[in-house]
């Protein structure tokens, strides 16, 4: 038997928001048991859907579009219950004045983009003219009235560039929470259904390893922040606040939020409004 193929092919998002899910794996040596692929959320989602990965993070929209082929891991996700800090709309004008205005999308991450579009159209009653471009805030603001940013670029805009340039920074997680009263889920961890059926024991072990890593990282969040601050443009306190602002749970409230998001955007985004989310069984 090809021994290397018994190691699960696991995805890893190269954003700060996923560091607490992987930091503990490195500490325990569990990473040695994985064939790890690092990339952006969009690329990892594509690889999981295509079958190039067995297990990994998948953006919520891509998960819902491919729910028949994927099984979600319970109690692990990247989300928020209120502000998220790293998914933002940066604007030069109030959001309700963006009708017909140019809005730059600094990411192809369908979930954050669909959330921003949903909020602007249904909560603020505007239909901007959207276009996609690299996530460089100063360039975006030369051509657009507002910009949608995610991940580390959004964190920089939120903490550094927005205040420096005198721009309004609107947190997508906070806007959603104010509007619906619900948390939000940006990405879930999932296994391909065919892999989970073929390798149920390994799949459950990977799930358990991620939960243990998440728990260890949050218990030692100051250490995680201290290490991350060595190579990031943020100080330890900012990173510790960020890691504890993020919500890495995926339970009943988060499932309710997924149901509500699907109801609102499913038919225009490529999945049924009542799409079913299947969770990995213990």
Swiss-Prot record:
Recorded hits in InterPro entries, A to Z, give: Menaquinone_biosynth, MqnA
What is the documented function of this protein? Catalyzes the dehydration of chorismate into 3-[(1-carboxyvinyl)oxy]benzoate, a step in the biosynthesis of menaquinone (MK, vitamin K2).
GO MF terms here are: hydro-lyase activity
Q: In which pathway does it act?
A: Quinol/quinone metabolism; menaquinone biosynthesis
Which transformation does this protein catalyse, written as a reaction? Answer: chorismate = 3-[(1-carboxyvinyl)-oxy]benzoate + H2O
Q: Which family does it belong to?
A: Belongs to the MqnA/MqnD family. MqnA subfamily.
Spell out the protein name for this chain: Chorismate dehydratase
Could you provide one GO biological process annotation from this protein's UniProt record? menaquinone biosynthetic process
Q: What is its EC number?
A: 4.2.1.151
* Protein's organism: Streptomyces coelicolor (strain ATCC BAA-471 / A3(2) / M145)
Q: Which Pfam families match?
A: VitK2_biosynth (PF02621)
Gene name for this UniProt entry: mqnA
Query: Which SUPFAM superfamilies does the record cross-reference, listed alphabetically?
Result: Periplasmic binding protein-like II (SSF53850)
Q: Which UniProt keywords apply?
A: Lyase, Menaquinone biosynthesis
Report the superkingdom from the record. Answer: Bacteria
KW Secreted (keyword) present = no
Deletion: any effect?
A: Cells lacking this gene require menaquinone-4 (MK 4) for their growth.
């Amino acid at each position: 038997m090809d021994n290397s193929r018994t190691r699960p092919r696991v995805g890893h998002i190269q954003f700060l928001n996923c560091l607490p899910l992987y930091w503990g794996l490195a500490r325990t040596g569990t990473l040695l048991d994985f064939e790890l692929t690092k990339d952006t959320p969009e690329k990892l989602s594509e690889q999981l859907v295509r079958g190039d990965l067995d297990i990994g993070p998948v953006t919520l929209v891509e998960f819902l579009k491919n729910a028949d082929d994927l099984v979600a891991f319970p109690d692990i996700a990247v989300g928020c219950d209120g502000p998220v800090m790293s998914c933002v709309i940066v604007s030069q004008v109030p959001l309700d004045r963006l009708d017909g205005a140019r809005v730059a999308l600094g990411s192809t991450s369908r979930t954050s983009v669909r959330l921003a579009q949903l909020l602007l159209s249904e909560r603020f009653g505007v239909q901007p003219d959207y276009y996609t471009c690299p996530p460089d805030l100063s360039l975006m603001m030369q051509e657009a009235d507002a910009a949608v940013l995610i991940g580390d670029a959004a964190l920089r805009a939120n903490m550094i560039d927005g205040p420096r340039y005198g721009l309004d920074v609107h947190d997508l997680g906070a806007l959603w929470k104010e509007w619906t009263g619900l948390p939000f889920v940006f990405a879930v961890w999932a296994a391909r259904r065919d892999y989970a059926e073929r390798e149920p024991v390994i799949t459950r072990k990977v799930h358990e390893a991620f939960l243990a890593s998440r728990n260890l990282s949050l218990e030692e969040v100051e250490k995680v922040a201290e290490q991350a601050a060595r190579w990031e443009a943020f100080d330890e306190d900012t990173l510790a606040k960020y890691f504890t602002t993020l919500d890495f749970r995926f339970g009943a409230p988060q499932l309710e939020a997924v149901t509500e998001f699907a109801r609102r955007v499913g038919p225009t985004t490529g999945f049924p409004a009542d799409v079913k989310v299947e969770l990995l069984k213990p």
